[in-house]
Amino acid sequence: MEESILRMHDKTTLKNMAFNRGLSRRGHNGRNASRMRKQDFIDFIMVQNHRDQSAVLGSDFLGDDMIRIFQEFIMDETFTFNPFIHLMGTIKNSTSKSPVSNQPSPEEDEPIPDLTLKPLEPCTKCECTTCMKNSIKQEENLKVHQNILNLESKIMCVVCQANVRNVVFVPCNHLATCISCSANPLMPKKCPMCRKGCKTTIKIFF
């Protein structure tokens, strides 16, 4: 269901729809269910709709369009977790041949997927059409490889640099660390990205 259609419903209707889709009393967007606004209910329903659609796709190909969309959202360090959840859910399902059986336990960290590109075989320099095409492909692969490295640096935990970020710090709403790092008793009660005080954290499961 499109967001524009959801906006036509009143808050009570959206609340009932959200509870039917699995909303708990703990709420969404850092608010308890009793304190959620109309937009919070819409955000929750949209996330659930996207997860349902992604589960049906089951594709194992991460296309250029997905990388481009992903980059547009994460180029800004001040992004919040709502669009990030939306994209990470898609990527998780699109890179898994069995989305249901391969999902990690909610309390386990998710490692960064291996997105290494296989380079083209080198050839001697010449002016033939085949070699020129291979040269162009090599340049394109290098650009894509660099983009992937940039993406990995954006989605990795800013503390351990090994696992996927899946813990949101409230109230700044930065998606910054993995579950293990956020649970470390030695870690200060501050967001590691903006250094602002943290009132609570929210675990995001994809």
UniProtKB/Swiss-Prot annotation:
GO terms for biological process: protein ubiquitination; symbiont-mediated suppression of host apoptosis. It comes from Invertebrate iridescent virus 3 (IIV-3). One of its GO terms (molecular function) is zinc ion binding. It comes from the Viruses. Pfam families: zf-C3HC4_3. Residues 95-114 are annotated as: Disordered. Residues 95-105 have a biased composition (Polar residues). The keyword Zinc applies. Keywords: Apoptosis, Early protein, Host-virus interaction, Inhibition of host caspases by virus, Metal-binding, Modulation of host cell apoptosis by virus, Zinc, Zinc-finger. This is Putative apoptosis inhibitor 021L.
